[in-house]
Amino acid sequence: HFVARSRYRRPKTIRPTRGAGAPVQIVRVARREDQTRHLFDIAKTCHSETAVLFRNHESALPLIDLCERAGIPYCYRGGEGTFFGSKIVRDITDMITLAYDARDTEVFMRVYYKFGVPISRVQAQYACEESRRAGCTVWQALCAADGIRHRLRLQAEELAHGLARLPRMNAGDAVRFLTEELGYRKYLEQKSMDTGKLEILAQLGENLPVPSLLPGRLQSLQMTLKQHANSGAPLILSTIHSAKGLEYDRVFLLDAIDGVLPARPEIACQTPDEIRQYEEDRRLFYVGMTRARDELTLFFCAGEGCSFVQEVIYNLPENRARREAEQQAQARAATAAAPPARPAVPLSDVT
């Protein structure tokens, strides 16, 4: 039923070749990161074949981080992806570096315009030159510049004060502070860039007491992935693409949320290309579900849009049966409430 709704799909009739397995399990969580906590609890006692499938390899990184810390074996089949080399990861690590060393003019020039403070390139270059000449921070040099507007000086001082607070936070809080309080999310939204990587970074930072440890942890995780590609562990972490043609006894679909899978919800698809991408996302979600041989578990995140999972929930047999029962009950009630029909008058009585 799910894949049959794809408008660009050739009509096919799919018939099962085996009996019914266990019903689809829906795990309801409040937030995206709660999926990782649930899966980590599963991983602790995983002794039989269990696959966690996802669209983007970065979705698995918080779970991999926890498994590494706890010494839980796993097999990773997702490739390196683009997460570690992405501009967003580079920006966050640069901002953390600047928070620890406000004299790093090279880093400052890479990020000064991403905080929402209207610093011109000429002003930024002057601040760097003055910082190197006088040995002061770039913020001190900028705020002391002749002709700087009072409002800009106040904004720069506030930004410098905010960055100075970062080293006293854990890395997860620091990522969220940069994102929400220091303007980085607004910058990404203005550029129409994906903000999903920010949540992954924040989750990875939760177990790091200070932000300065985050860049090193990212490098460590990047190297770790290469060491688990051929592991024989029962816990398998794989992209859906890598799982095509394979089946697993038990499957969990991770991050089936709007913005990830699908990349864009159906209501937001306007152009033919966007619609085709949405249909491709439907097929990918279907592929993920059908990798389950015996058990399938989906997450429904209350704090996120989950249009594909909602559609599955709507069409679960028990929900369809309940709707049909309600419709029948409403029909019976309407029939009972209707006034009795008037008897027909014989034609012979009509004058």
Question: Language-model features: where?
Answer:
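Helicase P-loop NTPase motor core
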Residues: 1-73, 97-101, 165-169, 347
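Conserved helicase motor core of SF1/SF2 NTP-dependent helicases
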Residues: 1-5, 13-16, 147, 257-263, ...
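Short, conserved phosphate/pyrophosphate- and ester-handling motifs at nucleotide-, phospho-/glycolipid
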Residues: 3-7, 120, 245
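Accessory helical subdomains and C-terminal extensions of nucleic-acid helicases
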Residues: 45-49, 103-236, 295, 314-335, ...
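Conserved helicase core region in the C-terminal RecA-like lobe
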Residues: 56, 115, 213-263, 280, ...
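Conserved RecA-like helicase motor-core motifs
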Residues: 71-82
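Conserved short internal alpha-helix adjacent to the catalytic or cofactor-binding core
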Residues: 80-116
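C-terminal accessory regions
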Residues: 257-334, 344-349
